[in-house]
């Protein structure tokens, strides 16, 4: 089962009754590939994220993004892979315009709730900021800086 298909809902996964997960196999990353994960936790006494974002990028020798994946969490019932955000990064030097487009796509894909910790609108905004920051960090790491 592909990792992105494992979780099927809040507290649910694709395993049938009696099945046991015994191994997770991850491919080795390609050269000039790196990632970053950020989460926003406004209250230090609770380790519950208001929003989270993970970005993986692969760069060519010129520094152009040739592959990307963007995932967001705590802004929908399950973690979301946001293909439109990844597409906004691919083919670019990961400049401000590309990062802003990825952030906007992530915000648009989110479907957060309002709860005691913050409003849905705030979560929608902060997840875009986290995507932008995580993409910058991943790019810096992929360049070897």
Model-found features: residue ranges?
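C-terminal structural segment of proteins
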Residues: 1-145
């Amino acid at each position: 089962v592909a990792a992105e298909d494992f979780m099927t809902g809040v507290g649910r996964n694709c395993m049938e009754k009696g099945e046991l997960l015994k191994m997770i196999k991850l491919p080795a990353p390609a050269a000039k590939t790196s990632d970053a994960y950020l989460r926003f936790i406004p209250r230090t006494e609770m380790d519950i994220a208001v929003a989270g974002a993970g970005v993986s990028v692969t760069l060519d020798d010129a520094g152009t993004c040739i592959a990307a994946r963007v995932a967001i969490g705590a802004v929908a019932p399950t973690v979301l892979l946001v293909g439109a955000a990844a597409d906004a990064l691919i083919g670019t030097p990961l400049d401000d315009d590309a990062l802003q487009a990825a952030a906007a796509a992530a915000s648009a894909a989110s479907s957060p709730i309002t709860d005691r910790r913050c409003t849905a609108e705030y979560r929608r905004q902060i997840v875009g900021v986290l995507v932008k920051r995580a993409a910058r960090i991943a790019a810096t790491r992929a360049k070897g800086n």
